[in-house]
């Protein structure tokens, strides 16, 4: 049986790690062990931040909706409550897009939400 030499595979693996680490500062781009640690951490950060991005965008959309709602004389939570009472299903992404790019349509939605709210918003819901 022929002897297996692993030099080609080892060099290929190390080269792949060092190429992935190009652009990092100092030893992290030049030494294999440091580069491997940093690439592993980078992949973990990448994975976690892809999950975090969803919440970050939702937070941004809510801030934009709240600012536009307050400009129209209503708060964010009352706007959402009124839209649910009026059975209007518009997600926050689209609401934020309307708030930024189409103020007239957003103002119309605020009007509908205002009319759908009960006069006493703290009154118990009718069953």
From Swiss-Prot:
Keywords: Ribonucleoprotein, Ribosomal protein, RNA-binding, rRNA-binding. InterPro entries: Ribosomal_bL20, RIBOSOMAL_L20_CS, Ribosomal_protein_bL20_C. One of its GO terms (cellular component) is ribonucleoprotein complex. The keyword Kinase does not apply. One of its GO terms (molecular function) is rRNA binding. GO terms for biological process: ribosomal large subunit assembly; translation. It comes from the Bacteria. The keyword RNA-binding applies. Belongs to the bacterial ribosomal protein bL20 family. Binds directly to 23S ribosomal RNA and is necessary for the in vitro assembly process of the 50S ribosomal subunit. It is not involved in the protein synthesizing functions of that subunit. PANTHER family: 39S RIBOSOMAL PROTEIN L20. This is Large ribosomal subunit protein bL20. It comes from Streptomyces avermitilis (strain ATCC 31267 / DSM 46492 / JCM 5070 / NBRC 14893 / NCIMB 12804 / NRRL 8165 / MA-4680). The lineage of its organism: Bacteria, Bacillati, Actinomycetota, Actinomycetes, Kitasatosporales.
């Amino acid at each position: 049986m022929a002897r297996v030499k692993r030099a080609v595979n080892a060099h290929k693996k190390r080269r792949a790690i060092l190429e992935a680490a190009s652009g990092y500062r100092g030893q992290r781009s030049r030494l294999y062990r440091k580069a491997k640690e940093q690439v592993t951490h980078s992949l973990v950060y990448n994975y976690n931040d892809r999950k975090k991005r969803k919440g970050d965008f939702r937070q941004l959309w809510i801030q934009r909706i709240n600012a536009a709602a307050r400009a129209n004389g209503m708060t964010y939570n009352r706007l959402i409550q009124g839209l649910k009472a009026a059975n209007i299903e518009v997600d926050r992404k689209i609401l934020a897009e309307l708030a930024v790019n189409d103020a007239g349509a957003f103002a119309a939605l605020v009007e509908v939400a205002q009319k759908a709210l009960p006069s006493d918003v703290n009154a118990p819901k009718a069953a």
